[in-house]
């Protein structure tokens, strides 16, 4: 195990906090965004689907990127990309769409590689650190959903996006000291391991369960607020 920064655990916690909040609050304030931009709410509905599309696309080659760039370096670039994507959503409607795509792509890469990052840095604390970031993600998502409307009413939808961008920026800055402690993923054996996984019933059970869990979560986040 290589040396690691003292900011690794705080970085993991803040990554958990930033892993859902930049886009899960959007359905709650779609009405305010439509009024602010002078467009129909229906034209903004795709904002809730764009991150999920990015999840699908960028999950496919996140591992290859980590093998070439390294985990810590890739997380640094992804968090920077996440912050910029969140920021440009404030400018106009086209950049709102582009920024949402950037947010989704960044989170997709982080989401896929976070377990590998923990394993590379703290192989003896995988369970603890996984619980830590999942818990921080759940609490942050709940708080963001609860506070989104009061914050928007007290300022505007842009005020809420600014706060979320500052959260992303704080995560990036706290993570930055970890950039120098870079781990590269080892190349995986292709054909045999893939065949075994695809014929494993337990793997398919987990895939189906996770798929339905995500379906219920994102459906609720999209439709219940409105």
Q: What are these regions, as identified by a protein language model?
A:
Residues 24, 51-60, 141-142:
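Residue-level signature of mid-helix packing/kink "hotspots" within the transmembrane helices
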Residues 26-27, 202-226:
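Extracytoplasmic gate region of multi-pass secondary transporters
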Residues 94-100, 206:
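Short hydrophobic/alpha-helical segments at membrane-entry points of transmembrane helices
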Residues 124-125, 131-180:
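Helix-loop-helix hairpin linking two adjacent transmembrane segments in secondary transporters
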């Amino acid at each position: 195990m290589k040396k690691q920064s003292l900011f690794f655990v705080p970085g993991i916690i803040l990554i958990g906090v930033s892993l859902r909040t930049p886009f899960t609050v959007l359905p709650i304030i779609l009405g305010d965004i439509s009024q602010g931009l002078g467009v129909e709410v229906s034209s903004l509905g795709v904002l809730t689907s764009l991150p999920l599309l990015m999840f699908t696309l960028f999950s496919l080659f996140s591992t290859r990127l980590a093998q070439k760039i390294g985990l810590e370096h890739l997380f640094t670039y992804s968090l920077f990309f996440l912050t910029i994507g969140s920021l440009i959503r404030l400018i106009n409607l086209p950049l709102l769409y582009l920024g949402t795509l950037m947010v989704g792509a960044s989170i997709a890469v982080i989401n896929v590689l976070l377990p590998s990052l923990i394993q590379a840095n703290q192989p003896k604390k995988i369970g603890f650190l996984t619980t830590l970031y999942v818990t921080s993600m759940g609490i942050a998502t709940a708080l963001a959903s609860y506070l989104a409307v009061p914050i928007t009413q007290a300022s505007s939808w842009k005020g809420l996006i600014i706060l979320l961008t500052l959260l992303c920026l704080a995560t990036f800055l706290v993570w930055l000291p970890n950039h120098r402690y870079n781990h590269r993923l080892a190349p995986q054996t292709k054909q045999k391991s893939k065949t075994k996984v695809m014929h494993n019933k337990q793997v398919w059970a987990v895939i189906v369960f996770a798929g339905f869990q995500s379906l219920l979560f994102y459906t609720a986040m999209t439709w219940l607020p409105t």
